[in-house]
A protein has these predicted regions:
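Bacterial N-terminal signal peptides that target proteins for export
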Residues: 2-11
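C-terminal motif of bacterial Sec signal peptides marking the signal peptidase cleavage site
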Residues: 19-21
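Sequence contexts marking disulfide-bonded cysteines in secreted/extracellular proteins
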Residues: 23, 28-30, 134-136, 168-170, ...
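Acidic/polar, low-complexity intrinsically disordered N-terminal segments immediately downstream
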Residues: 25-97, 188, 209
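Short, flexible loop/turn segments at beta-strand junctions in immunoglobulin-like
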Residues: 51, 147-149
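Extracellular Ig-like/FN3 beta-sandwich strand-entry sites
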Residues: 55-57, 150-156
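Structured domain cores in non-transmembrane regions
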Residues: 68-147
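Glycine-rich, aromatic-bearing surface loops/beta-hairpins
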Residues: 145, 155-209
Length: 209
């Protein structure tokens, strides 16, 4: 009788082990395809004047929270990613409309400035650098750039969509508008006659004399 009971328990135990071994592993990308966005945050350019001397130092800085309210679902989300990055576009408006990253020396005091030769073409790199934010804070991402003009002209800067993929593969997108009282878009208007909604949202203009 003891032997029969033991065999019965062995069969049950074996069945349990088999079920456990066949259990589907947890999907590490349970939120693949999910996107969360916010466009209420700002970046700041300094000094806020519409013109700066050649060789002077300008600053671009920003801070965005890990936790925010998604503007589409109105739900509270938290970004636990260890990377947040995105493009900074630099263009000359006058005297010639062209990509103009080489007209500035851009270095990071907080975060990183990356010449991304893997994901960007040689043509794109003439006007774009990838900004990688500092992610060491438990509640926010931060960046601060030092910008030194190397050539005279009228320029536009645009910090475009900054994004990251969380550990569960959800995509978090931050859209930052310059928080300065005046973005000096009159320079753009004078050159092109109109300002699109995208330019009005992202762009900050100034003159280097």
């Amino acid at each position: 009788m003891v032997i029969k009971i033991s065999r019965k328990y062995l069969v049950i135990a074996g069945s349990i082990l088999l079920l456990l071994s066949c259990k589907k592993p947890k999907d590490p990308c349970s939120k693949r395809g999910f996107e969360y966005s916010s466009s209420i945050f700002h970046c700041w350019y300094g000094p806020s004047t519409d013109s700066v001397p050649l060789g002077s130092i300008m600053m671009l800085e920003g801070s965005v929270p890990r936790a925010f309210t998604d503007e589409y679902t109105n739900s509270k989300v938290t970004n636990t990613s260890s990377i947040l990055n995105g493009p900074l576009g630099v263009g000359m408006i006058l005297p010639n409309y062209q990509a103009a990253i080489d007209s500035f020396e851009i270095t990071a005091e907080v975060g990183k400035v990356i010449k991304d030769t893997i994901n960007l073409s040689a043509g794109q790199l003439k006007g774009v650098r990838t900004i990688e934010w500092d992610c060491s804070s438990i509640d926010s991402f931060k960046m601060r750039l030092k910008i030194k003009p190397l050539a005279k002209g009228i320029y536009s800067f645009a910090l475009k969509q900054q994004s990251s993929v969380d550990k569960d593969c959800a995509l978090y997108k931050y859209f930052l508008q310059p928080g300065n009282t005046n973005q000096h878009l009159n320079y753009w208007m004078d050159a092109f006659g109109s300002v699109s909604s995208s330019v009005a949202f992202y762009t900050y203009c100034f003159k280097v004399y």
